[in-house]
Design a protein with these regions (language model features):
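Conserved acidic residues
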Residues: 17, 41, 134
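N-terminal Rossmann-like dinucleotide-binding module
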Residues: 1-27, 33, 248
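Beta-loop-alpha module in the N-terminal Rossmann-like domain of NAD(P)-dependent dehydrogenases
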Residues: 5, 23-85, 97, 105
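C-terminal helix-rich "cap/oligomerization" subdomain common to oxidoreductases
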Residues: 32, 42-47, 91, 249-299
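NAD(P)-dinucleotide binding in Rossmann-like oxidoreductases
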Residues: 182-187, 195-251, 255-258, 266-270
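Rossmann-like dinucleotide-binding domain that binds NAD(P)(H)
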Residues: 141-210, 272, 276
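A contiguous active-site-proximal alpha/beta segment in oxidoreductase catalytic domains
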Residues: 50, 73-144, 295
């Protein structure tokens, strides 16, 4: 994945002044940056997920803007810490959830259905209604692949869809109530989350006989289905390029702005969403894999 990022950034005119393929090389590279020998405009972290914590912390501490591959962390607690420290230190952290830039997602965001859905969620939240008027169902399956085997299926596949949900829905409407894991293994998860004003079902399988990337949304007797793996015009946009452009745009505005809690920029809201997605996915490990399914804390 790192080579793909490098190649596409270089096509946009970005020059890489340092590349690390091992932990030792990364350590040496950070030392050169800290000493002032190297003065990069930003860093890209596309290493195994278990190393993201270490590298993101270093970037935040140095206030070095960073694009980090998903997931930003495999710990809900660490994700919350990143969110706090990034805000406190005014450090730009951009998580590489390229699915946000899928053409199907971008087009759906422009539809009347999407705007009505977001309006209803806000209205129901303000009225303090505890109902499930809107239901999401995310399905993401594919055959066996040796990639990303350093993390379980929820951090490999399901995290994409949880991030999409967080980017679709205002956080006030996502007050967590309960979680039910219908099925859970290292390669397959079927989980249902109940929030205050919506229900979200996730099916992710990385050892499946079929390939699927769909989002189904039901509201007021109507429904829409998004096929994230198909493009009607026959000319699929390269989501990773759109992701890079969004990061570079954020980087440009970041250099000329001051961040505070009352005026968070779009890039910070995106980072908050990515961190919240990790927190919600982490509940599976905390509540089920550790045998604490009956200790759900709505906080």
């Amino acid at each position: 994945m790192g080579q793909r990022h490098k190649r596409l950034f270089e096509e946009d005119g970005v020059e890489f002044i340092g590349v690390a393929d091992t932990t030792a090389e990364a350590t040496a590279l950070f030392k050169r940056i800290k000493s002032g020998e190297l003065t990069p405009d930003f860093a890209v972290v596309a290493s195994p997920a278990v190393t993201h914590d270490e590298y993101v912390k270093k970037c935040i501490k140095m206030k070095l803007p960073v694009l980090v591959e998903k997931p930003v962390s495999i710990s809900g607690e660490d994700a919350l810490e990143y969110q706090k420290h990034a805000l406190k230190r005014n450090a730009l952290v951009f998580v590489g959830h390229s699915e946000r830039f899928n053409p199907a997602i971008e087009e759906f965001a422009k539809t009347d259905f999407c705007k009505e859905m977001q309006g209803c969620l806000k209205s129901w939240f303000l009225q303090k209604q505890d109902v499930f008027p809107i239901c999401f169902k995310f399905t993401r399956t594919h055959g066996f692949s040796p990639r990303n085997r350093d993390v379980s299926v929820e951090y490999d596949l399901m995290i994409h869809d949880m991030d999409l949900l967080c980017s679709f829905v205002d956080k006030n409407a996502m007050l967590y109530k309960s979680l039910d894991c219908v099925e859970l293994s290292d390669d397959r998860v079927h989980a249902i989350y109940d929030f205050r004003t919506l229900k979200a079902e996730f099916i992710a399988d990385r050892n499946s006989a079929s390939d699927a990337r769909t989002v189904e949304i039901s509201m007021k007797g109507r429904s829409v289905t998004l096929d994230l793996g198909a493009y009607r015009n026959g000319n699929p946009a390269y989501a990773l390029q759109h992701e890079h452009q969004a990061f570079l745009n954020y980087l440009s505005s970041y250099k000329n702005a001051a961040l505070d809690e009352d005026s968070a920029y779009d890039w910070y809201r995106d980072f908050y969403d990515a961190c919240y997605a990790v927190v919600l996915v982490a509940l599976i490990g905390e509540l089920y894999k550790k045998g604490r399914a009956n200790e759900i804390d709505a906080k």
